[in-house]
Amino acid sequence: RYRAATGREPTVLLEPDPPGWLTGTLRLAGWDPASCVEWAGAPARVDRLVVPLHRNRYFTPRDGQFADDFNPAPGDVRWLADRMQSNVPDLDAGEFSPRVFLSRRDTATRPVANEDAVRETLEPLGFESYALGEMAVADQVRLFANAETVVAPHGAGLVNVIHATDATVVELFPEDKVEPYYFCLARQLGFDYHWSVYPTREEAMVVDTGDLRATVSRALDG
């Protein structure tokens, strides 16, 4: 909209040595990462600063505003999803399961201590395990565009639900990291949302597989 209204091409600032998921996302959203500027956060002077209309307030449940203040605009979310999907060929190729479990085997933060048991619990229900860090951004878009049910430990990979059409989300929280971000995102998109909280041991979440089976079964029946 800024470009259409002003005829100016805004400069996008990136962190130094940006990760592949970031450059891949920019490329699918229509920006060439090569035309962006890497900025380490040092003091800088700009002639014109563009401030987006929709800004989100970050908070924790302890603020007492768990559900109401983190409200990404649905129109903005859909705009980004539509723009990215328009640049992904074979979006409906059908190569991924519509029942998705997001593994954390590709990250050192907030691992699942008994992930093998979690996977064995979900497989009879038709779920397949995917590690997003091992997938190209375009494949992540394809995965979520065809997803019907997503079971995932709390983590940034759940942002990809913006590519789903009508999904059910089951979020698994470690007891020391209960945050509202993806509940609010799912709510804004009109998705069914379920959650469970589990204890941690040495910074790894320990999932009660009996509770998980019951929670996911309720979600599938809903």
Predicted regions mapped to residue ranges:
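The feature primarily captures lumenal catalytic ectodomains
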Residues: 1-222
